[in-house]
């Protein structure tokens, strides 16, 4: 391919059209260095279309476009043909084919692919919430959360929080340590929102030893000591008993399995 300009015209951002053009260009050796892509977004008037056609006519460029408003699309096609400018309609024929095959009527509204729905924003918000209120960083998150996970170290609190966040649930998690008093919010929040993550001493002992090894540390450290683990789990049992919340045994469960159990529990509650 010799040096040429491809004009990407869109009534929205033009990202979709540019990606298609780049995919096509990639099929030609060395073409990415020889081809200039010029994106013209948010085209809604005939004047802009005439300007682009004049540019393409002058330098022998190609116009690739995603224009969903029929009048604007038809105008570009008509003007390009008058000027003998090569054009390619990326989305129009597909919309028309889908209307013909499925019997649906298109909305013909620019930018719909970027009109992110409420569901998407809820997911993003939940993920940000999980990060902000991870590992008991801010106890205020306990009262704002849909779910509060509590458990000793290495009971998958953080990955569970993130997994559930992708289901649009705001999750805070709180570590339970005998030497640290749990935040008072744990005892004022609705117990039905709290889930205790239970684990067997032997399983936790194995997990912690593997964790220490992965960090290059001695697996005989107090962190993986079975007596210390039993002490932590006894303290955990006292806390969940005081809260009066449900408990899920995570001993031999994958994160996905535990998350689905918790999700189902919350769904039934609602």
From Swiss-Prot:
Binding residues annotated for ADP, in chain numbering: 151-158
Catalyzed chemical reaction(s): N(tele)-phospho-L-histidyl/L-threonyl-[pyruvate, phosphate dikinase] + ADP = N(tele)-phospho-L-histidyl/O-phospho-L-threonyl-[pyruvate, phosphate dikinase] + AMP + H(+); N(tele)-phospho-L-histidyl/O-phospho-L-threonyl-[pyruvate, phosphate dikinase] + phosphate + H(+) = N(tele)-phospho-L-histidyl/L-threonyl-[pyruvate, phosphate dikinase] + diphosphate
EC supergroup of this enzyme: transferase
InterPro entries: Kinase-pyrophosphorylase, PPDK_reg
One Pfam family recorded for the sequence: Kinase-PPPase
EC code(s) of this entry: 2.7.11.32, 2.7.4.27
Record keywords: Kinase, Nucleotide-binding, Serine/threonine-protein kinase, Transferase
GO molecular function: ADP binding; ATP binding; phosphotransferase activity, phosphate group as acceptor; protein serine/threonine kinase activity
NCBIfam families: PRK05339.1
Job description of the protein: Bifunctional serine/threonine kinase and phosphorylase involved in the regulation of the pyruvate, phosphate dikinase (PPDK) by catalyzing its phosphorylation/dephosphorylation.
HAMAP family per the UniProt record, alphabetical: PDRP (MF_00921)
PANTHER family: PYRUVATE, PHOSPHATE DIKINASE REGULATORY PROTEIN 1, CHLOROPLASTIC
Family: Belongs to the pyruvate, phosphate/water dikinase regulatory protein family. PDRP subfamily.
Official protein name in the record: Putative pyruvate, phosphate dikinase regulatory protein
């Amino acid at each position: 391919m010799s040096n040429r300009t491809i004009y990407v015209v869109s009534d929205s951002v033009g990202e979709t059209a540019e990606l298609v053009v780049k995919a096509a260009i990639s099929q030609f050796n060395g073409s990415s260095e020889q081809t200039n892509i010029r994106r013209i977004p948010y085209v809604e008037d005939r004047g802009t279309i005439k300007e682009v056609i004049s540019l393409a006519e002058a330098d022998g460029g190609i116009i690739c476009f995603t224009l969903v408003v029929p009048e604007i699309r038809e105008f570009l096609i008509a003007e390009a043909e008058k000027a003998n400018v090569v054009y390619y309609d990326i989305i129009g024929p597909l919309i028309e084919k889908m209307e013909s095959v499925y019997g649906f009527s298109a909305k013909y509204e620019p930018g719909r692919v970027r009109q992110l729905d409420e569901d998407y924003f809820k997911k993003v918000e939940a993920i940000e919430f999980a990060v902000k209120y991870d590992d008991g960083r801010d106890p205020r998150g306990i009262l704002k959360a849909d779910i509060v996970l509590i458990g000793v170290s290495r009971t998958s609190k953080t990955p569970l929080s993130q997994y559930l966040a992708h289901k649009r649930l705001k999750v805070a998690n709180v570590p339970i340590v005998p030497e640290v008093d749990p935040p008072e919010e744990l005892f004022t929040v609705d117990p039905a929102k709290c889930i205790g993550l239970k684990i067997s001493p032997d399983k936790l002992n194995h997990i912690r030893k593997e964790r220490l090894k992965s960090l290059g540390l001695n697996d005989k450290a107090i962190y993986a000591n079975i007596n210390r683990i039993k002490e932590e789990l006894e303290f955990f049992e006292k806390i969940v008993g005081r809260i009066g919340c449900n408990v899920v045994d995570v001993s031999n469960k994958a994160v996905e399995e535990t998350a689905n159990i918790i999700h189902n529990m919350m769904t039934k509650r609602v």
